[in-house]
Curated annotation (Swiss-Prot):
GO terms for cellular component: collagen-containing extracellular matrix; extracellular region; extracellular space; GABA-ergic synapse; glutamatergic synapse; synapse; synaptic cleft. PROSITE patterns: C1Q (PS50871). Homohexamer; disulfide-linked homotrimers. The trimers are assembled via the globular C1q domains. The trimers associate via N-terminal cysteine residues to form disulfide-linked hexamers. May form oligomers with CBLN1, CBLN2 and CBLN3 prior to secretion. Strongly interacts with DCC in a NTN1-displaceable fashion. Weakly binds to NRXN1 and NRXN2 long and short isoforms produced by alternative promoter usage. Interaction with NRXN3 short isoform is hardly detectable; no interaction at all with NRXN3 long isoform. Glycans are attached at N29, N88. The gene is CBLN4. This is Cerebellin-4. Residues 1-27 form the signal peptide.
Amino acid sequence: MGSGRRALSAVPAVLLVLTLPGLPVWAQNDTEPIVLEGKCLVVCDSNPATDSKGSSSSPLGISVRAANSKVAFSAVRSTNHEPSEMSNKTRIIYFDQILVNVGNFFTLESVFVAPRKGIYSFSFHVIKVYQSQTIQVNLMLNGKPVISAFAGDKDVTREAATNGVLLYLDKEDKVYLKLEKGNLVGGWQYSTFSGFLVFPL
């Protein structure tokens, strides 16, 4: 028994346990099995930290991630005409067709609202059609530009302003695309805006 306990002490501090339906898990005294139904991902940490936004943590360092850690969206412009949505001078680039919206955190106004603190990935592809004026597209975080992309080749019928970034966001932070310079008179059909939660913090 003594050697067995010494062997257990050598187990790494981080363990992943995946239980299958009906699989018995034995108690520490090996007397009676504990039957767990369904699937459960358990992360053991020798130095646990309390997370009040989506994870529960015990003194033993066992943390179970909440379901709202799954966040993703992708939207596209499905028509090629100048819409009235941009006439309000906000210059927010509007996407009329939402392809993916896991968690429903991408609004009908084409603004993503972060549900929790974490690292998020964003990318965009805004097409300029049939006009020679250069456009500048900014990815905005709470009203401030973070990154930009440009499209301005006069000899190309269709050109795209494209960029991507990883961002640290707090809960309720807002991310959207803004047309900083130029216009989209010819429309921006097939333009896309996508994002997802890489991991929560």
